[in-house]
Amino acid sequence: MNQKLPKILIITRGVWDDSKGTSSTLSNIFCNYNPEQLSCIYIETKKPNTKICNTFFQISEISLIKKIFKWNTKTGQEINSEYIENDSLAKMEASTMNYVRHNRSFFYTFLREVLWAFNGWKSKELKAFVKKVNPDIIWADGSPLILMNRLSKYITKLTRKPYCVYEMDDVYTYKISNYNPFRYIYKYFLRKNVSQLITNSSQLFVISPKMKTEYDKIFNVNSKILTKGIDYSDKEFKPYKVVEPIKMVYMGQIIYDRLSVLQELGKIIDDINVVGKKIQLDIYTTNHIDEEIKSSITRKGNVKFNEPVPYDMVTKVIDEHDVVVYAESLNKQYEYVARLSFSTKITDYLASGKCVLAIGPKNIAPMEYLKNEDAAIVANSYDELRRFLVGDNLPVLIEEYSMKGFYCGLKNHNKKDIDKMVAETMRTIVSI
């Protein structure tokens, strides 16, 4: 632990839970901190599960609804190790949010923003918490929600302390997959909040080189690229011989039409395996899949759906395979979903020493990065994917890119270098 680092108050949407990959980025960035130097504000009614940070303030959106009808309802509270989670409230909120995410209607986003517009979250408890933790720096996670940007702006004004912003998705440009006039209106107001937050920040962190290029120009800043870092101190590249059947694995969500990519990959594998079992694809996902669709993908026995494994078992599963698949939809309807983003899984895949097979449109940040770094087998179309997989030199390609990917990770995502950059940036901000 480094006692000389400044105290940081982190503002993020979801609960900090180290058992889930979604929280791995925060834990990765701040794991060298003394937990007493960190505090966190979040808006999910769940108990944190992390050893990285001990001090939390939770804003309950269900309580915000109740406050409309009963104004003295408490909407936020400090969370510590003795806190007992309100199961009924947590389940109610989780059920509500799962429904909203499943339906993906802009109407629910609008209702959520209206709820926050009542400002019931600006509680005396929140003000007391911020005063108590007295941070040196505010760390604001970027968000595609106006409400989260409003929360971050409010806290920065409350503390009058310097702050940095970490953008992981394109929250600013008008490049939206589905045309909807209401979404454009929403984006207009989101842009105003994002612009104010970034323009007044001491440092902007971004997730990908493509985002840096665009946002530096838009906001006239010199942003710093920050990805999940990998500890290479005990890692060394171990070459492996590829033998048939080649074992491929996909691990992750299949939302945003990623399932269609896996379906096409499965069809190509089925065609190849007509003359004998040459490739096997394993899929691990937490998402529900219609049984009819699942049956159509697996009917020839070349693709298998597996029960999801805990986050700490992911490395073991990858080690058992030759190729790890990273997929984004090739459907133009979804072309902007990952346009500037960079999945935390990519750094894990590169560090695994296994070949990465990346499938997706050529103009999005992950594909551009892997192509420019020559760190993966990159297929920007199904025809290109088929050419790679039917080629006689596929085993040689896999062995070659397993090494290239590993050393790309060592060069660009070494945790030692990233930790040093973040720590130096934090110290510089405080000294300004």
Region annotations inferred by a language model:
Residues M1-Y83, S223, D231, D270-N273:
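N-terminal subdomain of nucleotide-sugar transferases
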Residues E44-T45, V194-S223, V422:
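A short, active-site helix/loop in glycosyltransferases that binds the activated sugar's phosphate group
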Residues K124-A128, R150-L158, V171, Y184-L204:
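Membrane-proximal helix-turn-helix segments that form the acceptor-binding/catalytic region
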Residues K210, K228-G229:
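Carbohydrate-associated surface elements
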Residues K241-L262, G266-I269:
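Conserved donor-binding/catalytic core segment of Leloir-type glycosyltransferases
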Residues D257-S260, V314, V324-T347, V356-E368:
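Nucleotide-sugar-dependent
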Residues N380-R427:
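A charged, aromatic-enriched C-terminal amphipathic alpha-helix characteristic of glycosyltransferases
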